[in-house]
Amino acid sequence: WDKSIDDIGLDRGDAVIISVPFSGSGRKHERWKWLIEECNTKDIPVFVDCAWFGTCFDVEVKLNHPCIKMVAFSTGKGLSCGNWRSGIVFSRLADDDRCSLELQTEWRHGIHLNVAIANHLMAKYGPDTMPKKYMEAHAAVCEHYGFETTNTIHIAVAPQTPEWREYHRDETFNRVNIAKAIKRWKSNGNFAQ
């Protein structure tokens, strides 16, 4: 997979998977509007991965475009229950086998304990809980390390310098997961050396 949409464009028969917020930058993808218009025009199906829902803020997209066929949400990051994975997929393909229970597990059954834990947490915490709790820490960590803040609490964008090169995504973003630094700062006000 050495070519991307930026390299070769989109044609009928293609399919698109995109994350919201975009995993490369922790923000809405800068070409979201163009991508959706192009996919609507060329009848290209789109799968939207919203795994970071609950950790992001001020990211707004409409998911009712005809090209968007499936949208997935996860509870791992937003409810801080990563070891108890659960999520939901919404689909326009209701009669299609791709929407069957097979998507959940090879054993053809849901993981009921994980779903029960997620339901309990969702009843208690809203999608803005993490951003509200960690917004100040996110800004402090980004300022301390010279990162750009993003719209995703646990993600920052590092400068395009050699010391951050290992974090690059497609030569465009040096995305850094700052979750541990945020928790450290939030609990004792310290930064790692």
Language-model features: locations:
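PLP-dependent class I/II
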Residues: 1-193
